[in-house]
């Protein structure tokens, strides 16, 4: 599993976490940092062993290169010689060797499918696997599409073999799509065959007259991806009819002409595959504001393109991508609202058109200093949402407890906002916020104002290195602190807990919660 070195996230002791499976790191030798790897890739040294040539690699050839000093790995159809990278891999050589001489795509996806390996390993590229590519069908070939819909008998033929092999899951039916037009508009309709589809399950991008519409259905992704046959306006509308699971995307024509077909089918069009097997898609977003929140944490607000529909679900994260010294570096961050108080600051843009992040700047890091150097008006690439937190976990919850350390507070922002505005069963939501000093507390004033305004909300601050004037709680997460904090509103009330912070904080917190008789079903840990 190719885990590209990272200094900024999750750095040792970092508090900004995402929800995924954990992994172990091994100490790297001196001179084996990410910057050292980038310098090596730019040194001109032949890292492939092929003296600059690219080859087609058969399965038989790939299997031969399965030793530490001669290790080839296939990721998503491309073969890399990762022998030079062995000493730079923070997950250790043994992790890389698990995929030696084989297809490592699944192992790679288990941990860091978001890593931009194409950029990080481009100087190690040996070539492509010798696999006959699928021939894409367009609207002018063979089977004609009537209003975008094939007869059911032909539907399976349009899916790539690797897609049909994984579908359908027993409790999921493959979605389908149709389209129709008026003189001024084109409407694409996706039939998800699932109820309770919400707007944040739909991601739409219009780029250079190609339409990419993704519907996230449970743990699968359905994609409509076409090169439109005619030009359309960049503004469009998205509507979800939740009770029948129907999605409507309405495009406005630039010219009042009759379309003979929707357009040419592009990569993975009409596919329905597990979300973990999909690649990340990025769109360029513009930085519109940047303001200090604490001495080392800033609030970055980005504007989405007008031709994008993207709403990040509660408790989920996205990936930010920047070019650093010529290499593309990707880091995960959890979006937040621009304020905890609706009238604290009037938003300058529609909430559906901008996305904000609370990000701690690490002066010695690689990514965050580069991010901090961005000027208003500059652009940064933002992926679609990722993460396994579902608001369905909060159904009928009466007592919600949030445990956060440092910037582990970020996923709690949307959870807190959702709880206070959408949970009719909620009696109490309590936040215990751990920091080093008073100066490190993010949005302290807003949290205190919210507690005064909202009778269901309480916040407690805990400092590990307080000033002599501090009158609040002190120390680190402990059984004594949690026992006092985790008081239910009634003896049999339904409770749920979220915890996020540095890995040792989260691990210890979950252990203590188990000791206090909270079950796994009552706990969600945002861990890296």
Swiss-Prot record:
Protein family per UniProt: Belongs to the flavoprotein pyridine nucleotide cytochrome reductase family.
Binding positions for FAD per the UniProt entry: 372-387, 399-431
Disruption outcome: Mice display insulin-deficient diabetes. Embryos and fetus develop normally. At 4 weeks of age, mice show have normal blood glucose levels but impaired glucose tolerance. Isolated islets have markedly impaired glucose- or arginine-stimulated insulin secretion. By 7 weeks of age, they develop severe hyperglycemia with markedly decreased serum insulin levels and nearly normal insulin tolerance. As the animals age, there is a progressive loss of beta cells in pancreatic islets, but there is no loss of alpha, delta, or PP cells.
Protein name listed in UniProt: Cytochrome b5 reductase 4
Tissue-specific expression: Ubiquitously expressed. Isoform 2 is expressed in testis, brain, skeletal muscle and in the male germline.
Biased composition regions of type Low complexity, renumbered to the chain: 13-24
Residue span, FAD-binding FR-type domain: 280-392
Organism: Mus musculus (Mouse)
UniProt-annotated stretches for the region Disordered: 1-29
């Amino acid at each position: 599993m190719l885990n590209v070195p990272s200094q900024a996230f999750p750095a040792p002791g970092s508090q900004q976490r995402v929800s995924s499976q954990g992994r172990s790191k091994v100490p790297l030798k001196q001179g084996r940092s990410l910057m050292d790897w980038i310098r090596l890739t730019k040194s001109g040294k032949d890292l492939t062993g092929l003296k600059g040539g690219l080859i087609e690699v058969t399965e038989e050839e790939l299997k031969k290169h399965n030793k530490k000093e001669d290790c080839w790995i296939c990721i998503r159809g491309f073969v890399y010689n990762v022998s030079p990278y062995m000493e730079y891999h923070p997950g250790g050589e043994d992790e890389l060797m698990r995929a030696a001489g084989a297809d490592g795509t699944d192992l790679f996806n288990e941990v860091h499918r978001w890593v931009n390996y194409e950029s990080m390993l481009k100087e190690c590229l040996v070539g492509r696997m010798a696999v006959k590519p699928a021939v894409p069908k367009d609207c002018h070939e063979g089977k004609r599409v009537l209003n975008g819909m094939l007869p059911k008998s032909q539907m399976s033929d349009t899916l790539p073999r690797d897609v049909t092999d994984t579908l359908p899951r027993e409790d999921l039916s493959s979605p389908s799509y149709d389209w129709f037009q008026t003189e001024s508009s084109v409407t694409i309709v996706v039939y998800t065959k699932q109820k309770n589809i919400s707007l944040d399950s739909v991601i739409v991008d219009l780029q250079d007259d190609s339409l990419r519409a993704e519907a996230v259905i449970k743990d699968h992704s359905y994609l409509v991806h076409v090169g439109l046959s005619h030009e359309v306006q960049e503004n469009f509308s998205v509507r979800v009819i939740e009770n029948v699971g129907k999605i409507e995307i309405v495009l406005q024509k630039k010219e009042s002409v009759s379309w003979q077909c929707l357009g040419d089918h592009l990569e993975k069009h009409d596919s329905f595959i597990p979300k973990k097997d999909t690649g990340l898609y990025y769109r360029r977003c513009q930085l519109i504001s940047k303001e200090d929140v604490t001495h080392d944490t800033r609030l970055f607000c980005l504007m989405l393109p007008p031709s994008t529909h993207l709403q990040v679900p509660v408790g989920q994260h996205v990936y930010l991508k920047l070019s650093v010294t010529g290499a593309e570096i990707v880091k995960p961050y959890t979006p937040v609202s621009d304020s905890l108080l609706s009238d604290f600051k009037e938003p300058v843009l529609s909430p559906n058109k901008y996305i904000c992040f609370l990000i701690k700047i690490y002066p010695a890091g690689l990514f965050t200093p580069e991010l901090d150097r961005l000027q208003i008006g500059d652009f940064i690439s933002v992926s679609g949402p990722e993460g396994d937190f579902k608001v369905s976990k909060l159904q009928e919850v009466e007592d919600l407890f949030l445990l956060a350390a440092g910037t582990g507070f970020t996923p709690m922002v949307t959870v807190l906002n959702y709880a206070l505005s959408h949970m009719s069963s909620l009696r109490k939501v309590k936040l215990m916020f751990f920091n080093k000093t008073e100066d490190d507390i993010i949005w302290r004033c807003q949290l205190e104002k919210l507690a005064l305004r909202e009778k269901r909300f309480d916040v407690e601050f805990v400092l590990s290195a307080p000033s002599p004037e501090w009158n609040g709680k002190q120390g680190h997460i402990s059984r004594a602190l949690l026992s006092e904090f985790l008081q239910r509103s009634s003896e049999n009330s339904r409770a749920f807990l979220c915890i996020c912070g540095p890995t040792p904080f989260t691990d210890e917190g979950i252990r203590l919660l188990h000791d206090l008789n909270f079950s796994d079903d009552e706990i969600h840990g945002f861990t890296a």
